[in-house]
Swiss-Prot record:
GO terms for cellular component: host cell endosome membrane; host cell plasma membrane; membrane; viral envelope; virion membrane. This is Envelope glycoprotein gp160. Residues 708-859 are cytoplasmic. The keyword Metal-binding does not apply. Residues 32-686 are extracellular. Residues 514-534 are annotated as: Fusion peptide. The lineage of its organism: Viruses, Riboviria, Pararnavirae, Artverviricota, Revtraviricetes. One of its GO terms (biological process) is virion attachment to host cell. The gene is env.
Amino acid sequence: MRVREIQRNYQNWWRWGMMLLGMLMTCSIAEDLWVTVYYGVPVWKEATTTLFCASDAKSYETEVHNIWATHACVPTDPNPQEIELENVTEGFNMWKNNMVEQMHEDIISLWDQSLKPCVKLTPLCVTLNCTNVNGTAVNGTNAGSNRTNAELKMEIGEVKNCSFNITPVGSDKRQEYATFYNLDLVQIDDSDNSSYRLINCNTSVITQACPKVTFDPIPIHYCAPAGFAILKCNDKKFNGTEICKNVSTVQCTHGIKPVVSTQLLLNGSLAEEEIMIRSENLTDNTKNIIVQLNETVTINCTRPGNNTRRGIHFGPGQALYTTGIVGDIRRAYCTINETEWDKTLQQVAVKLGSLLNKTKIIFNSSSGGDPEITTHSFNCRGEFFYCNTSKLFNSTWQNNGARLSNSTESTGSITLPCRIKQIINMWQKTGKAMYAPPIAGVINCLSNITGLILTRDGGNSSDNSDNETLRPGGGDMRDNWISELYKYKVVRIEPLGVAPTKAKRRVVEREKRAIGLGAMFLGFLGAAGSTMGAASLTLTVQARQLLSGIVQQQNNLLRAIEAQQHLLQLTVWGIKQLQARVLAVERYLQDQRLLGMWGCSGKHICTTFVPWNSSWSNRSLDDIWNNMTWMQWEKEISNYTGIIYNLIEESQIQQEKNEKELLELDKWASLWNWFSISKWLWYIRIFIIVVGGLIGLRIIFAVLSLVNRVRQGYSPLSLQTLLPTPRGPPDRPEGIEEEGGEQGRGRSIRLVNGFSALIWDDLRNLCLFSYHRLRDLLLIATRIVELLGRRGWEALKYLWNLLQYWGQELKNSAISLLNTTAIAVAECTDRVIEIGQRFGRAILHIPRRIRQGFERALL
């Protein structure tokens, strides 16, 4: 019974099995994946490129930064854009940032360019006979109650009045005198206190800064060329070397003032929350520590006095400008609010104590070195100040913020005595020096301290000592630029991406489509944090923004280059602008060349014939397109992109070969082309030519026949009559008696053929011939189609019967197999049951056997 039940349900199983097999086949076919090219994907890679600058310089101002920026920079964007990249993390390293090196080279170029047209002071490298200029102090009322006379009084020997001999071109030798600061002089003979020379005469070429040029820096923006972008980290507690979770993209940095200073960072950017401590390696005492403050500390610097400026001419267009002292000589100084400074040092000490794991932080003055390092050196309105900061860095703090050192009575402000140098060692390179001409009148500049540069005394932070001594440092201007560029990095945009899809390229006729120009460039990376599926929907917009950004930046660069052309001053920055322009065009053309080689010109999504290899990535489509960003996907397949590109190129070459062979057989590509109106017009023309040819031949032969008959005496114009000719023998009657003598159907013959009659006969015979042949051809075609249809139907019926037969055989085989299996299972089950029964009976009979054994034993 069970076998019969299985046989009855077999048909349902058979149907469900066939459906399952079909579904499996469909799924196996649907899993075929193909490489698809996407243009405009938000992907970038770290890169090094030539940056250009933008500024709002005014060319009519003589400030050196204005002149340099006017020649070198493009105007700033009046509406800068910053695009937040959601769900994007990026690694930054402020200590390995090529932007810092570029800015360092640019500031060197700024100073070199500002000194090129100025006077070289080589004629002054002579022996100077100098005497001290005695100065008197002013009273405390005029100087201010917070500063003592001793603090403002110029030390004896600080300023010297020197005389020397010069011989101008075309004139006799004459003696001149000039006033120099003691820091700018070197004593020649120790035994003679009056013989001096300028400090850099034996090592450097001294160039006097142009008298109408100042050194007040203006903000300069660094911008990336088209095809590149600048990533900005917006994490408020970013230490410079970690993974940033709040990333945005900008085309230019914020305005950076290239302030050249040591120990104290002036007029920079502030930390948004707490004070930030940054160092390449805090445990290495050779690495500087950069402190970014969260609040500014005002520093007010002044050079008092009624100094004047006088010129000493020693050649055509050459003059040395020296100081003319009028009245009292007073020392330059800077003042800082003591409360603000103590609060700043307290916060720095607490932060350093937690980072260095020290309980006591000691701030001490510089340990020695060049004046540029041992003092706070900076430029104030054209004069170079060297201020003693020992009063600033002279305290001890616990890591909880308590001050341990005995502070003197607070006067409200800290006064830093400053010295002024006119011969400056160029910080950027050796062998060069600059003479800063004196500035007349009182000089005052108000600046904001936004950071510190500190050095740690020798020893490792792992020492058992709980004390840590920190001193002011500096000298490497790269640290100044790092303090502003720490949150930026330059990346190269890679708009080409490949990913697997189910779409395969179809060979169809394509129309060329031009890619239009969009708006701005920065929106290109706006979809970087989106999944690949979401980002692929904006490829057109991103590709347009890429090209639009290139065009826009090229226009800006061209305007800057044109400005340099009419000034006839194509500087190093002008060359960089040309490089940026060429680089942007090359990047775009390179991408378009690859798209053209792959047969994807004018497309943002381009399918290919290349099957996706699971060894490249075995992720599922849903996982790729719904869970991954383009950046994550690019990192995963970065090792295989070269292989994929080669396969796409080879596939395109093979496709072009196939298309060429197909075009050679284009006329046979479709039977429907035979029935186009142009083809039928061609057929009609051929038919007319054939018919006309036949008629022409017939006419020629008729004329020849007529000529032949005329020669034989035949007249073609005589009237002839047509007589009926009998169809049978002449003795046969024309009718039949039973039929009432009805005449049979006969045909007439033409006794004499005329010219018109011959033409008519030929046309009639030709039409009849064509009709008969076409009718026969149609009948033959009908018979062939009928025969093929019948044979085809018979073949289909035969195949159907064969399929039914084999299906029935398979069905019978399956039923037989199931029957055999059921019988075998039943027999096996019976055997098992029987064995179990026997085993059970044996167990049940054990007591009986024991009893029988006892009975036999008793007998």
